[in-house]
Structure formats: C-alpha cells, structure tokens
C-alpha cells in the first residue's frame, strides 16, 4: 500500500489521480488532499477517500468546509487547514510516501518544494516547478534523498524509454545528469487545436476555439498552451532539467494522433518510443506505482484500429512560443521563470478576452526582452518568486496600456 498526497485534488490531474486510487484500493490510499476553492468537490472527495488532512487555499472557505465535513458524519473527520501554510503542511504530511502535484502554474512551486524538503517522492504533473526553479529543485532533490517521477505523458514516456538504457536500474533520472547512452530526445506534440488551420486564420481565433483540444481532455490553460505550442516549449525546458539533455538535443515533432508520447534516440542510432492512448491516467499511474506496473482494465492499444501514425516538423511561424521557450531555456537562470509567468498572465488575459490569441507570444516576448538586463544566472528561491511576480505585473501593465501589438 502506498500512501499518497494529492495537491490540487479538485483539478484535472487531481480528480484523475483519485479515480486511480478508487480503482486500485489495495494499492493506494489518499491520506492528504488540497484544493483552491472548490469545497463542494473537496467535500465529496473527503467522503469517498477519508483522508487524514485536507487544506483549502482560500482561507475564507475554511469554516464552510468544516461545516460540510461535519455534515458527513464520518467516524473520524480529517484535520482541516487553510491558506498557503495549510497547503504546505499537506504537501509535507508525514504519513504520505508520494506527493502528486496537480496544482496548475507556478502556484505549485512552494508546495512542491515543501514536499521535497520533507523527503517525499514527487509525481510531478506541475511542470512549472522545474521550468521556473530547475536550478533550485534538482539540488534539493539530492539533498533530501527525494525522487522526482514525471506524471505528464511526454516525460513519462521518456522516463519509461530510458529504462532500456544500460544500468538503468542504478540510475537516478531526476539529477539533471544526462544518462549514459542517450543521444537525443524527441518530444511529440499533437499540434493543438489549430494544427490544420492556415496561419492567416489565427487572427480570428476565439476562446472557445483555443480551449477545444482534438485529442486530450485537459484544463483551459494547458489547452491554450497546446494551441500555441508553449506547452511543448515548456516541456523542452523540463526535459533539459529532468534528463540533463542539452537544448540542441531536444527536438519537437508534430504527431497528430498522439499515440507515440515521446521517443529517445540512443548513441547507436536506435530509437525507443512509448505508445498508448491519449489518456493522462496512464502516466499518472506509472508515476504512482513505479518501479512496479499495476494491472488495469483500461482499453488496450490497437494499432490496426489506428491505421497510421504520421509526423511533421512544427511551423516556427505558426508557433512562435516554441522559439521563445528554447531561447529562454538557453538563457537559463531566471529567464524560464519569466517566460512561464508571462505566459500564464498572457493566457489568463486571453481567456478573459482582453487580448487576442496572436498577442499571447507578443507579450511574452516583451517580458523576456525587458528582463534580459536583470537576468540572474544563479538564483535563489526568493529570486524566482520575485521575477515571477514582476513578469505577471509587467504583462498586465503592458496590456492595460491598451496598445495594439502585432504578433511576432
């Protein structure tokens, strides 16, 4: 039995994680849950999973949550915490073996660091933690004897493929050191909602268009990131930190079927790939169960049913966010944190219909350019948090100026 903590239990990753726990009750027990504001769903999760502790980030909802839980008439009610301190306490909860980080965006950084500092194994679905704070996270993992296991499909695929390398059983794939025998990583991308749209039509994109993914069922923010290909650009940075691979050896390839989740190329020119239906539950389960594999009743992959797998190079003009991510990664230091925060704010403003779809990379680019003179190549955690806040304010202020920018 593995005891798990789920950070962001009411979100997409969190709900799927708890579905797995319900499907495998003899393998997993959720002992700690956290959420942002959704006390209705959190109450239902408490009823089903009976955790030892729960936390709600919005402190104004603590009493309402307590009332909801009291009305459940449980034999043993969980401890109820609130605010950021409560979330951090849940992240470091003593009984948990593994912490699944499903909090969206850079908001998940501090709780993830709390879990690492408590020596927990991390099933990382919050890629922003590594993107913004990779230089801090990697040493902290080593210091606290903690292991980071990717719970997103692409990095889980790479992680699984890497186990085909020599001496993989002795390797620690969360050290930022490139595994022996690895030559290159090929990250597959669906191409997002607009993969078949002509570039000239992107000026007409609506929020509804951008939040409709052809293959995956995800939250709105990450679906927009998929449409801009920023999601894949961020995954390039994450792969760099996770697997110690240089940016020159991490490539993006459009794969519309989303069946091959990523590939690795080895020194002898062999290529290994991991295949599966586009379902986030599989990488989440593997991050939770590793080094074991647990039996499921999920639909088996049928290649004859699929018929064909196709690939093409991404269009740099159509996906400018991809180039911005590579550039920020190569700049290193605090630049990836600025990129990530600027993107989060730009996407937020797009979802509120304050800017157009094609303006998203424009405002990200402006933030990165403005930060260049203050780039810190050896940041501490406080520096990361400071530039994260600066980038959000910068983008919001630029948008408020009301200027009309052309897309880059």
UniProtKB/Swiss-Prot annotation:
One of its GO terms (molecular function) is 1-deoxy-D-xylulose-5-phosphate reductoisomerase activity. Keywords: Isoprene biosynthesis, Manganese, Metal-binding, NADP, Oxidoreductase. The keyword Transmembrane does not apply. NADPH binds at residues 10-13, 36-38, 126, 128, 219. Its EC number is 1.1.1.267. InterPro entries: DXP_reductoisomerase, DXP_reductoisomerase_C, DXP_reductoisomerase_N, DXPR_C, DXPR_C_sf, NAD(P)-bd_dom_sf. Mn(2+) binds at residues 152, 154, 235. GO terms for biological process: isopentenyl diphosphate biosynthetic process, methylerythritol 4-phosphate pathway involved in terpenoid biosynthetic process. Pathway: Isoprenoid biosynthesis; isopentenyl diphosphate biosynthesis via DXP pathway; isopentenyl diphosphate from 1-deoxy-D-xylulose 5-phosphate: step 1/6. It catalyses: 2-C-methyl-D-erythritol 4-phosphate + NADP(+) = 1-deoxy-D-xylulose 5-phosphate + NADPH + H(+). The keyword Amino-acid biosynthesis does not apply. Catalyzes the NADPH-dependent rearrangement and reduction of 1-deoxy-D-xylulose-5-phosphate (DXP) to 2-C-methyl-D-erythritol 4-phosphate (MEP). Belongs to the DXR family. This is 1-deoxy-D-xylulose 5-phosphate reductoisomerase. The gene is dxr.
């Amino acid at each position: 039995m593995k005891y798990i903590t789920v950070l962001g239990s009411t979100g997409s990753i969190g709900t799927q994680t708890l579905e797995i726990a319900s499907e495998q009750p003899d393998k997993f027990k959720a002992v700690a849950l956290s959420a942002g504001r959704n006390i209705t769903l959190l109450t239902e999760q408490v009823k089903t999973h009976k955790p030892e502790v729960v936390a709600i980030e919005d402190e104004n909802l603590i009493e309402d949550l307590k009332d909801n839980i009291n009305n459940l008439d449980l034999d043993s009610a969980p401890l109820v915490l609130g605010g950021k301190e409560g979330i951090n306490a849940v992240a470091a909860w003593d009984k948990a073996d593994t912490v699944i980080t499903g909090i969206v965006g850079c908001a998940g950084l501090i709780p993830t660091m709390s879990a690492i500092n408590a020596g927990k194994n991390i099933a990382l679905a919050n890629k922003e933690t590594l993107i913004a704070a990779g230089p801090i996270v990697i040493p902290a993992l080593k210091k606290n004897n903690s292991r980071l296991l990717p719970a997103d499909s692409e990095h889980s695929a790479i992680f699984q493929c890497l186990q085909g390398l020599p001496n993989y059983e002795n390797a620690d794939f969360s050290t930022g050191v490139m595994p022996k025998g690895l030559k290159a990583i090929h990250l597959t991308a669906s191409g997002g909602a607009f993969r078949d749209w002509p570039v000239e039509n992107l000026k007409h994109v609506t929020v509804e268009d951008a939040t409709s993914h052809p293959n995956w069922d995800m939250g709105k923010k990450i679906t927009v990131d998929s449409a801009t290909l920023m999601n894949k650009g961020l995954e390039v940075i994450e792969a760099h930190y996770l697997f110690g691979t240089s940016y020159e050896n991490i490539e993006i390839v459009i794969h519309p079927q989303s069946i091959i989740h990523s590939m690795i190329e080895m020194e002898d020119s062999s290529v290994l790939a991991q295949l599966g239906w586009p379902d986030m539950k599989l990488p989440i389960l593997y991050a939770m169960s590793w080094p074991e594999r647990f039996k499921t009743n999920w639909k088996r992959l049928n290649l004859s049913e699929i018929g064909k797998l196709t690939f093409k190079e991404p269009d740099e003009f159509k996906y400018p966010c991809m180039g911005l991510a590579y550039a920020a990664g190569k700049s290193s230091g605090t630049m990836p944190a600025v990129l990530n925060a600027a993107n989060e704010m730009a996407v937020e403003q797009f979802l509120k219909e304050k800017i157009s779809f094609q303006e998203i990379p424009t405002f990200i680019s402006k933030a990165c350019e403005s930060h260049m003179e203050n780039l810190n190549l050896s940041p501490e955690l406080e520096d990361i948090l400071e530039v994260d806040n600066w980038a959000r304010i910068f983008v919001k202020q630029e948008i408020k100026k009301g200027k009309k920018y052309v897309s880059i």
